[in-house]
Regions:
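Active-/binding-site microenvironments in catalytic and ligand-binding cores
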Residues: 1-323
């Protein structure tokens, strides 16, 4: 049976079917993050039973995935460049003794979406529009005048749920090019005895990152073929009313894309600017998956605020699962 190819007409229909513009008012700039209520956060805190904190981030260094061989151009993204401004050698030499202190200092230069990160609502446009109908030209050389990531700085806290698709299918990792379906996600909920609730942050493991790390090479990871969400999962996302969604791949959706030539990342076209979904990519999920399998609990408190960089369309993060 041939897979359906997503066309421009499909995108047009989806843009109306899944549109959340105006749902939280004409001035809204944070989209589905509105789904998380104060009570949701209180209840998420009650999930903490053993005081264990699990990071879902890769380290930010020159060993990251950017620059690896890939079928897709990097669009200027590099791994972080970390530079020391003052070192211990400087201190030993007495460079700052005249100021009465010995210290080190440093700086980093990096694309904001080069590692574990959130895609902000100013990142992807649907034709000439961004989230909530704002003109795409609101994102200027000075940054996003609307939907900047700083608008979310008191968000990204709530109940997290891990859906471990490879575990359900009894494989180490999903094959590159495998499109995760609504049925896969529903099966994972049942398998893990967990139900996605309104306002949740849903983390979906494919195993691809772990496969790359095990192989000792990121080749093919940034923009290459990958397992990921199929276009049909927009139905599931809409139904569940989740606050955010993240995965362990470079771009969340299945690659090669299911779309006709000329349409790149069709799932993104709808999820971000039309639905207002904040999306996490390049999440490191091995430790969380192992812990969830050990205690058979796939829900946890999730804390992953973006850096409030004014006008940014994405942000590096250190997401935490607290159990």
């Amino acid at each position: 049976m041939n897979k359906k190819v997503i066309t421009r007409q499909d995108l047009t229909e989806a843009s109306e079917k899944y549109k959340n513009w105006g749902k939280w008012g004409k001035d809204d700039e944070i989209g589905t993050l509105n789904f998380t209520s104060p009570d949701d956060i209180i209840n998420a805190a009650k999930l903490v039973k053993k005081g264990k904190v699990i990071s879902l981030a890769l380290n930010f260094d020159n060993n990251g995935p950017q620059g690896a061989k890939t079928s897709y151009p990097a669009m200027g993204r590099t791994n972080p460049i970390h530079t020391m401004l003052r070192t211990g050698t400087d201190a030993y030499s007495g460079v700052l003794d005249h100021r009465g202190i010995r210290a080190s200092d440093d700086m980093v230069v990096m694309p904001l979406q080069c590692g574990t990160q959130w895609d902000g609502l100013g990142h992807i446009f649907y034709e000439d529009s961004m989230w909530n109908g704002y003109d795409c030209r609101e994102v200027t050389s000075a940054g996003a005048q609307k939907c900047g990531i700083e608008k979310t700085k008191s968000k990204m806290v709530g109940r997290g749920v891990l859906l471990d698709i490879p575990k359900v299918k009894e494989v180490d990792a999903l094959e590159d090019g495998y499109g995760i379906t609504c049925n896969d996600l529903e099966e994972a909920e049942k398998f893990h005895d967990v139900e996605i609730q309104k306002g949740d942050f849903v983390i979906v493991r494919t195993g691809q990152m772990e496969a790359k790390l095990k192989a000792g090479s990121w080749d093919g990871y940034p923009g290459g073929d990958a397992p990921g969400f199929s276009f049909e999962t927009l139905d599931w996302i809409k139904e569940k009313e989740m606050a955010g969604l993240a995965s362990d791949t470079w771009g969340c959706e299945v690659r090669p894309n299911e779309s006709e030539k000329g349409i790149n990342q069709p799932w993104h076209w709808i999820a971000i600017p039309i639905m207002g979904l904040t999306m996490g990519e390049i999440f490191y999920l091995k430790d969380l998956a192992e812990d969830c399998a050990e205690d058979n609990s796939y829900e946890f408190m999730f804390v992953a605020p973006a850096l409030p960089i004014t006008g940014a369309v994405g942000s590096p993060i250190n997401p935490l699962a607290i159990k």
